[in-house]
């Protein structure tokens, strides 16, 4: 299929792996090498499997929406009439213009049942915006989760690993905030080092997967007080299920 880059130039490096900046310096017609087979396991098949019946909640910050667009396009490419009612995209950016693929995703919400909500963190600078406001991880704040559950057709308190699996792509702050807030609902991260720090048995299946832009740790597992607090929150959530 076609190769498509979704990049954004920024004045200050936000990652120690600045691929965007390297691409930005290339002139038109420059050659780059791309392997025939994509690497990585941030896919539906390599996480929960194509037949998992739960909601697939995809949380993206900025250009982090790119892998989710690829997943959704693949589904529609295989079947233009694919039912996307179990697919959910939560996309955050500073300004509406930075919500890439918004029109395409909104169109799929009409034709295929995709659930899509964009949110902007600087609404005061964009008066025409009438959608959700705040960072994308704010959808998981305790006072906002009931609204998200209602939009998803769930009863209050039912947004748990029994009903949904969560995928997050973005910078460390977004992933960390989403992960920590969803511990209170019993979501288990896929990262082995975090699972071990939280005392999650190896046979417990993960329900939150993430793709990180940079090598900054999502959770400081070397902070005893933090880990003790997070472990207690997770155990409380699991005890309620």
Language-model segments: which ranges?
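Histidine-anchored nucleotide/phosphate-binding helix
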Residues: 67-80
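Short, flexible hinge/linker loops that cap or flank conserved catalytic cores
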Residues: 49-52, 81, 158-160, 202
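Active-site-adjacent beta-strand anchor residues
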Residues: 58-61, 168-169
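Structural motif
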Residues: 55-57, 88, 165
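Ser/Thr-glycine-rich phosphate-binding loops at phosphate-binding pockets of nucleotides
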Residues: 61-67
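C-terminal region/appendage detector
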Residues: 21, 32, 76-78, 84, ...
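FAD-binding FR-type
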Residues: 1-57, 121-122, 204-219, 234
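Reductase modules of NAD(P)H-dependent flavoproteins
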Residues: 90, 95-241
């Amino acid at each position: 299929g076609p190769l498509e880059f979704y990049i954004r130039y920024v004045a200050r490096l936000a990652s120690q792996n600045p691929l965007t900046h390297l691409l930005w310096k290339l002139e038109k017609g420059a050659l780059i090498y791309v392997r025939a087979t994509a690497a990585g396991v941030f896919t539906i098949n390599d996480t929960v499997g194509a037949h998992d019946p739960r909601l697939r909640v995809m949380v993206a910050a900025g250009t982090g929406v790119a892998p989710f667009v690829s997943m959704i396009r693949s589904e529609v490419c295989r079947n233009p009439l694919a039912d996307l009612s179990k697919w959910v995209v939560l996309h955050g950016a500073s300004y509406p213009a930075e919500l890439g693929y918004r029109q395409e995703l909104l169109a799929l919400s009409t034709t295929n049942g995709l659930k899509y909500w964009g949110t902007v963190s600087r609404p005061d600078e964009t008066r025409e915006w009438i959608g959700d406001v705040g960072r994308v991880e704010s959808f998981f704040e305790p006072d906002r989760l009931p609204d998200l559950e209602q939009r998803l057709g769930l009863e209050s308190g039912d947004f748990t690993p029994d009903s949904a699996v969560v995928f997050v792509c973005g910078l460390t702050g977004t992933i960390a905030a989403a992960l920590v807030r969803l511990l209170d609902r019993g979501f288990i991260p896929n990262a082995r080092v975090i699972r071990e720090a939280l005392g999650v048995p190896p046979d417990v299946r993960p329900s939150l997967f993430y793709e990180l832009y940079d090598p900054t740790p999502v959770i400081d597992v070397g902070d005893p007080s933090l880990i003790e607090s997070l472990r207690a929150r997770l155990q409380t959530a699991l005890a309620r299920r």
